[in-house]
Each structure stands twice: as C-alpha cells, then as structure tokens.
From Swiss-Prot:
Keywords: Carbohydrate metabolism, Lyase, Schiff base
pH dependence: Optimum pH is 6.5.
Protein name according to UniProt: 2-dehydro-3-deoxy-phosphogluconate/2-dehydro-3-deoxy-6-phosphogalactonate aldolase
Gene3D superfamilies to which the protein is assigned, alphabetical: Aldolase class I
Taxonomic placement: Archaea, Thermoproteota, Thermoprotei, Sulfolobales, Sulfolobaceae
Organism of provenance: Sulfolobus acidocaldarius (strain ATCC 33909 / DSM 639 / JCM 8929 / NBRC 15157 / NCIMB 11770)
List of catalytic residues: 153
Summary of temperature dependence: Optimum temperature is around 99 degrees Celsius. Extremely thermostable.
PANTHER family to which the protein is assigned, alphabetical: 4-HYDROXY-2-OXOGLUTARATE ALDOLASE, MITOCHONDRIAL, DIHYDRODIPICOLINATE SYNTHASE
Function description: Involved in the degradation of glucose and galactose via the Entner-Doudoroff pathway. Catalyzes the reversible cleavage of 2-keto-3-deoxy-6-phosphogluconate (KDPG) and 2-keto-3-deoxygluconate (KDG) forming pyruvate and glyceraldehyde 3-phosphate or glyceraldehyde, respectively. It is also able to catalyze the reversible cleavage of 2-keto-3-deoxy-6-phosphogalactonate (KDPGal) and 2-keto-3-deoxygalactonate (KDGal).
UniProt-annotated site: Proton shuttle, residues: 129
GO MF terms, alphabetically ordered: 2-dehydro-3-deoxy-6-phosphogalactonate aldolase activity; 2-dehydro-3-deoxy-phosphogluconate aldolase activity; 4-hydroxy-tetrahydrodipicolinate synthase activity
Family the entry assigns: Belongs to the DapA family. KDPG aldolase subfamily.
Length: 288
C-alpha cells in the first residue's frame, strides 16, 4: 500500500521554479508519511517544463530524499535520453515517462520502442506512466511484457483497467492515479500516485492505516470526503486549486502554477476556501 506524491512545482510570479519552496514542500510530505515522490508529473506540470527545469527539480529534491521517481517524458527523445543519463548518477527509485502524444495513430511498436530506448540506457528501474486521457494512447500490457518494467502509474477512472495490468504483468507494481479511487486502489493494487497528497497527505495516510486495521467503513468515509473535494476542485481547475489548498491545509506558501495552468484570482481563491471549509472541518474531525 504505497502512497506516492506527484509533487507540484512551485513557481514565483516571474514563472521561475522556487527551489526552496519545492524542498520545504517535499520535506513536509515525507514527514506526513508519504512513501516516495513522483517528480515532474502532470501535477508538477512536467509536460510544460523545460529540460533544464526537469533536471533542476530532480537536483533540488535529491537534496531532500532519494525516494524519487523521475518523470522524463518528452516528444524530443534526445532530451529524454539526456535526462535519463543525468539521473544515472543518482541513487533514486526509478525513471518514468508518459507515452509519446499529439501524433495520431502511432503503431504500438513505436510506443514499445520509445520505452525500450529509455530502458536501454537507464541504470534505474522503469516505471510506465499511462495517461490515455492526456496522451491519446492507452499502453497495452502486451507491449510491456518484454520490457524491464518495475511499476506502472495508471491514471484512469476505471479501476478494472488498472487491474488488467496487475493480472497480466506478474511482479510489476501497479498504482492508480485517480484521487477518487484511492480507497479501492489501496485495497486492490500496490498503491496510489495521488495529487491530493500535496494538500491532504495525512488524510490519505490515515486511509491506509484504517484499511490495515480493518476499519474499512471509516476509510470509505474519508474517501467520500475526498470525492466531494474533487468535485469542488474541478470547478476551479484542479491543479491551480491545489496551490491554494496547500497553504489552506498545510499552512505554508508554495507560490503559483505557471501558464497554461493559470493561477486562481484572489476572488476565486477566496471562493474556493469558503466552499471547502465544511469539508475541511469534517476531515480534521475524522483524522485527528
């Protein structure tokens, strides 16, 4: 039952990565019981980061922990290879990549070749990042059987889809990436890579503790509150809202997202805080 945080990337008002804020945030997540950090994922605005920024994030977080999965995905394979080689010098958990995207009707052999190239030069374990809603490609288990895959992050609202990986790829760790499926993923998979760990890490850790104790009804009650939070965040833009809610729930500032993920206006941030306040109180009652 591993809980992995796809950490946000804090930016200042000029759009530069705030390394100090990133480190502070990572330290807090680990202190709250998060097992590992997924670097440069979707929540971390990975596809919108430059090669140098991706490298900078890894460097900064490596000062905090070695429990890192380094997401290197890009349409520029030369950049991917350079990032993988850079990470080879570090003692991290593994490297990961989303599939190629944008270009329609890529044959499966191209997807397989992309991951083969990463695995060929990496000294670390390979984690597949499957996000069909974002990339347009759903990576089938069949093309992964010949690859040295350690784990799969499956960002999918269909738990049965994640279970297909589990059933067809023995020995491969499978994590679901949906906040609304945390409870069910902890029960049936190897864990979760959930964006809500950025602002309510202790809630998700509490869910795991309750499940281990056999208190499934209590864990499910927390999931209900998480799902209600998810409904609210979608109205504002989930990733943008997370930056506001880290401060609201954890008590420190993580700056701003960067366009094309625009920060909330002051009015939107205030409205969000008001809307989640009843849920915040209920969560605090159940966790503490």
């Amino acid at each position: 039952m591993e809980i992995i945080s796809p950490i946000i990337t804090p930016f200042d008002k000029q759009g530069k990565v705030n390394v100090d804020a990133l480190k502070t945030h990572a330290k807090n997540l680990l202190e709250k019981g998060i097992d590992a950090i997924f670097v440069n994922g979707t929540t971390g605005l990975g596809p919108a980061l430059s090669k140098d920024e991706k490298r900078q994030n890894l460097n900064a977080l490596y000062d905090v922990t070695h429990k890192l999965i380094f997401q290197v995905g890009s349409l520029n394979l030369n950049d991917v290879m350079e990032l993988v080689k850079f990470s080879n010098e570090m003692d991290i958990l593994g490297v990961s990549s989303h599939s190629p995207y944008y270009f329609p009707r890529l044959p499966e052999k191209f997807l397989a070749k992309y991951y083969e190239e990463i695995a060929r030069i990496s000294s670390h374990s390979l984690y597949i990042y499957n996000y069909p809603a974002a990339t347009g490609y759903d990576i089938p288990p069949s093309i992964l059987k010949s690859l040295p895959v350690k784990g799969i992050k499956d960002t999918n609202q269909d738990l049965a889809h994640s279970l297909e990986y589990k059933l067809n790829l023995p020995g491969v760790k499978v994590y679901n990436g949906s906040n609304t499926l945390i409870y069910y993923s902890l029960l049936s998979l190897d864990g979760v890579v959930a964006s809500f760990t950025n602002f309510i890490p202790e809630v998700i850790v509490k869910q795991r503790d309750l499940i281990k104790q056999g208190k499934l009804d209590d864990a499910l009650r927390l999931q209900e509150l998480i799902n209600r939070l998810a409904d609210i965040l979608r109205k504002y833009g989930s990733i943008s809202a997370i930056y506001v809610l880290v401060n609201e729930f954890q008590g420190y500032d993580v700056g701003y997202p960067r366009p094309p993920i625009f920060p909330l206006t002051d009015e939107e941030a205030l409205s969000l805080k008001r809307e989640i306040e009843p849920l915040k109180r209920k969560i605090q009652e159940l966790v503490h």
